[in-house]
Amino acid sequence: MRNSIFEQEETFQDLSLRPKSIEKFVGQQRVVENLQVFIDSAQKRNDSLDHVLFCGPPGLGKTTLAHIISNELESRIHTTAGPLLSKAGDIAAILTNLHKNDILFIDEIHRLPSAVEEVLYPAMEDYHLDLIVGDGPAAKSIRINLAKFTLVAATTRIGMLSNPLRDRFGITLRLDFYTVSELLQLLQQAAERLSVNIENGAMIELAKRSRGTPRIALRLLKRVRDFLEVSDSDVITREFADLALNKMEVDQFGLDKLDYTYMDFIAKNYSDNPVGIKTIAAAISEKEDSIEELIEPYLIKIGFLSRTQRGRRLTGKALDYLSTINSARLP
């Protein structure tokens, strides 16, 4: 399993750092501008917002935007996740308790079983449920009308959604990795709210090592703050941040120990040939889903990895970087 600073449970403090309104949301400019139009239009029509699907890598703000939609529309939000909905009755119980204009947020919707998906089809399209009651010859179909609600869903694997489910979302918004300048703006806001005494150069260093991901940027800020609190310093300088990040084994690209384990395995055993995900997962004792969602997207983003149908292959850029790093490790 992944043992990393990048994989930790959200705390109450994490939640308190989330923006509550769309104007306070940092980054994802195109997504935010379009979402504002859709929200304003729904409010002008005095109608429910069309169903919304957010897709993109973890930690970019999909859940935050779902809650912002609820706040902007002044609607109640009900939250659940794909892995929690194992049978049709689970989703039916939630849907029948929704009120008009409520928001239902389903995280990891790509992990819904097909039986649950099929219940959602008529609920999303016509706002009713068709349930089978009883068994055998005595079984009968019952239709239950639902309040007009908005389904907001998030996925890191949009390709795993069935076409019928994906097509029922009227709004699909794709989130991308953040720029360093966007992360810097986010860190400035967070440092002020957390009362962290940090220089601008240190925040730039944090932003560069945050893998383009706000969630990681905030976690690194708090961990570097921990180093500050047990030191003799009273401010986080660039040098202090660099020292703390190096102690946490977060390099200049934001790569951590597991990223190196992944790349080292491929470089040492398959440097000239592609390798399959199952082989990698078995070798580094990690789940395929975790590799595909948490490791590979960023390696592809920075040009370290090529992913094809034949398998994974490290790029020349990655191999050169590993060679430099490994040379530095030698006594």
From Swiss-Prot:
Binding site for ATP: 17-18, 59, 62-64, 125-127, 168, 178, 215
Catalytic activity: ATP + H2O = ADP + phosphate + H(+)
Region (Head domain (RuvB-H)): 252-331
Major localization class: cytoplasm
Cellular localisation: Cytoplasm
GO CC terms: cytoplasm; Holliday junction resolvase complex
EC number(s) reported in the record: 3.6.4.-
GO terms for MF: ATP binding; ATP hydrolysis activity; four-way junction DNA binding; four-way junction helicase activity
Keywords per UniProt: ATP-binding, Cytoplasm, DNA damage, DNA recombination, DNA repair, DNA-binding, Hydrolase, Nucleotide-binding
Residues that bind Mg(2+): 63
Free-text note regarding domains: Has 3 domains, the large (RuvB-L) and small ATPase (RuvB-S) domains and the C-terminal head (RuvB-H) domain. The head domain binds DNA, while the ATPase domains jointly bind ATP, ADP or are empty depending on the state of the subunit in the translocation cycle. During a single DNA translocation step the structure of each domain remains the same, but their relative positions change.
Family as reported in the entry's similarity comment: Belongs to the RuvB family.
NCBIfam families documented for this protein: PRK00080.1 (NF000868), ruvB (TIGR00635)
Name of protein: Holliday junction branch migration complex subunit RuvB
Organism: Neorickettsia sennetsu (strain ATCC VR-367 / Miyayama) (Ehrlichia sennetsu)
GN (gene name): ruvB
